[in-house]
Amino acid sequence: MAQHDENVVWHAHPVTREAREHLQGHRGAVLWFTGLSGSGKSTVAGALEQALHQLGVSSYLLDGDNVRHGLCRDLGFSDDDRKENIRRVGEVARLMVDAGLVVLTAFISPHRAERQMVRDMLGEGRFIEVFVDTPLAICEARDPKGLYKKARAGELRNFTGIDAEYQVPLHADIHLDGEQLVTHLTRQLLDLLRQQDIIKP
């Protein structure tokens, strides 16, 4: 990784985050969806994005698979590459929050250290860790991409939940039961956003 160049300095923008938030009528923040593959992260995040759009809230969904088609296309699934994947997404999310958006990110992000890294990037009150807690057996039964089947057959190595560890969040900002209806989980998230004064009541 390249070292920071002392000749590269931060350039302050004339329009502040607060001014953008005032214009849009809501605060910028990241909801970081974490959980096993097949837990429902992308499904719940997508439902929340639709709900926010209907409420007139400017939002954007960063999906774990989608970013690997572009921003992170050069990365694999080693521990170092996973960390860099999360770092890049965290930096993009931080820029989006500065633009006043509500950012939804759906990533397995199996390690607590990487999730904490992004929390530290965002600062107090801007990072909401959403743990989509779905039992491994349920995730494996769903297996929407056929990845568990490949992992069990030894065709896919370093797969989270099978031969790579998933570190359960110890202090998630919201703990969702991934076996509940998506509509119910979406309501829970909207209630949280209102309670934290990110969107209007």
Curated annotation (Swiss-Prot):
Entry annotated with the keyword Phosphoprotein: yes
GO biological process: hydrogen sulfide biosynthetic process; sulfate assimilation
Active site per database record: 109 (phosphoserine intermediate)
Origin: domain of life: Bacteria
Transmembrane segments: none
Key words of the record: ATP-binding, Kinase, Nucleotide-binding, Phosphoprotein, Transferase
Listed EC numbers: 2.7.1.25
Pfam families the record matches: APS_kinase (PF01583)
Enzyme class (EC, first level): transferase
Binding residue positions for ATP: 35-42
GO molecular function: adenylylsulfate kinase activity; ATP binding
Pathway note: Sulfur metabolism; hydrogen sulfide biosynthesis; sulfite from sulfate: step 2/3
Reaction(s) the record says it catalyses: adenosine 5'-phosphosulfate + ATP = 3'-phosphoadenylyl sulfate + ADP + H(+)
Family listed: Belongs to the APS kinase family.
Role: Catalyzes the synthesis of activated sulfate.
Annotated HAMAP family: Adenylyl_sulf_kinase (MF_00065)
Protein name: Adenylyl-sulfate kinase
Source organism per UniProt: Erwinia tasmaniensis (strain DSM 17950 / CFBP 7177 / CIP 109463 / NCPPB 4357 / Et1/99)
Record gene name: cysC
